[in-house]
Regions:
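Conserved pre-ATP/AMP-binding loop-to-beta segment of ANL
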Residues: 50-68, 74-75, 85, 97-105, ...
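Hydrophobic alpha-helical scaffolding
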Residues: 16, 56-59, 79, 83, ...
């Protein structure tokens, strides 16, 4: 972890690094390997004396931030996102992908350093002036049912997760939980950031149907850090559409030949 952070800081020429108190030990190790002007917690920076600084308005083609890729196939790369590109993607997500209204409310446990959390659940509700509730990612990993509790109590309408998040919730649910949640408000349960596996998603929908969860709320999404976040959304209110194909033909010839769902040689 320290090695990866060091390489990321070096690759972008960072001068300052900020971390919560819980991660300062890592940052102190990093500072021994990377030449930084200053490191510290947000509270450390708040204590610095203020100075008058004149800011010039940024042009549309100037950088807004660096978004690092997931690093699933190689070392994370910093993608430079300019001002106009991020605003365009935010508009497309709000207007066309999710078709947001003033009645929507976001709920998220996604980490802020990931494009799905940063763009989808911080910047989108921010520019749309919509309410959002946040659950720390670590807390979700330990107590995933809190995610459902927040959606239920605050009448959340938009919430996303990779497939594993839905699978984790379904695994931790008990029959006695069904009376605790009302998920009828959840209209867009986006799925992305990893392979969209229909098996755990169907289990999630079946387990939470007594709580008012509608399987048609599932929205398969595809995104890339290089494109800010969203590349495509499945249509809203239709749920998942799954094609079953012959796995051998797909892997050897690239042919999507229909196959029986229950066959041992089937890929979804």
């Amino acid at each position: 972890y320290v090695g990866q952070i060091s390489r990321m800081l070096e690759s972008c020429g960072a001068a300052i690094a900020v971390a919560p108190a819980s991660h300062m030990g890592f940052l102190e190790e990093v500072s021994e390997q990377v030449d930084l002007v200053m490191t510290g917690t947000p509270e450390d920076f708040d204590q610095l004396p203020e100075k008058e600084v004149e800011f010039s308005p940024l042009r549309p083609d100037e950088p807004a931030y660096l978004q690092y890729t997931s690093g699933s196939t190689r070392f994370p790369r910093g993608v430079e996102i300019d001002q106009s590109t991020v605003l365009d993607n935010l508009h497309e997500i709000a207007e066309h992908g999710l078709k947001l209204t003033h009645q929507d409310r976001f709920v998220s446990w996604l980490p802020y350093y990931h494009d799905m959390g940063l763009i989808g659940f911080i910047l989108v509700p921010l520019i749309c002036q919509l309410s959002a509730d946040y659950l720390p990612s670590r807390t979700f990993a330990m107590r995933p049912r809190l995610w459902l509790k927040i959606i239920s109590e605050n009448r959340g309408t938009i919430s996303s997760s990779p497939t594993f998040g839905y699978a984790l919730c379904a695994k931790r649910l008990r029959p006695s939980d069904y009376d605790k949640y009302d998920l009828s408000s959840w209209r867009a349960a986006c799925v992305g950031a990893e392979q969209v596996n229909p098996v755990p998603l169907k289990a999630f929908a079946e387990n939470l149907a007594p709580c008012g969860f509608d399987e048609n709320a599932f929205v398969a999404c595809y995104g890339m850090a290089e494109c800010v976040l969203a590349v495509s959304f499945a249509p809203l209110d239709l749920g998942l559409s799954v094609d079953y194909v012959d796995q051998d033909l797909m892997s050897t010839q690239g042919l999507a030949a229909p196959a029986d769902e229950n066959s041992t040689n089937t890929a979804a």
